[in-house]
């Protein structure tokens, strides 16, 4: 092979490597997931570190045995949760998009992570299938306001039943309407807002109060 021929081949090879690298990047995987099913992905841009820290702030990590995440996507929240999670705890990440689940399973090497292709409405069945009775905390970025009719209510009710007393449902949204889906099932709801995110997000911490045990 001549020197000129070798130089001619290097260009296409570099291009192929760049395309392959880009196709495997979290940003590209996230965009693919959004385009594939925008109704189930809240935003085309992953959450900011500021939002993540604020959302996870109230969690009592030393008490966590099981943390559940709805709609993990490419792991924008999954990795920070694992960084805070006790060594003997588990994180169950549930997503309806099998591409995201496959990506997480391959990209994150952590035995505490259990990535499940499924619906958040089936959270109780999923956690029981992995040997748990309740979750301590459940996190969601699912776009409740654009979910099919009835799905948001089903998820809100199922989530409240799956969380232990004293635990919480952590929700970050771009529409405050999510409160309508969770208020009927939680005893106390705190609300916050984060401007340093694209787009700015409303945050909710919906708590299961211990006094609710008598009512149950």
Which role does the model predict for each range below?
Residues 23-25, 29-62:
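Class I SAM-dependent methyltransferase Rossmann-like catalytic core
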Residues 63-73:
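Conserved class I S-adenosyl-L-methionine
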Residues 74-86:
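Conserved SAM-binding loop of SAM-dependent methyltransferases across substrates and taxa
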Residues 90-95:
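Conserved SAM-binding motif I beta-strand of class I
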Residues 101-132:
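S-adenosyl-L-methionine
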Residues 153-165:
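A short glycine-rich, Lys/Arg-flanked "PGG" loop and its adjoining helix->strand segment in the class I
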Residues 165-173:
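Conserved beta-strand signature within the Rossmann-like core of class I S-adenosyl-L-methionine
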Residues 193-216:
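Core SAM-dependent methyltransferase catalytic element
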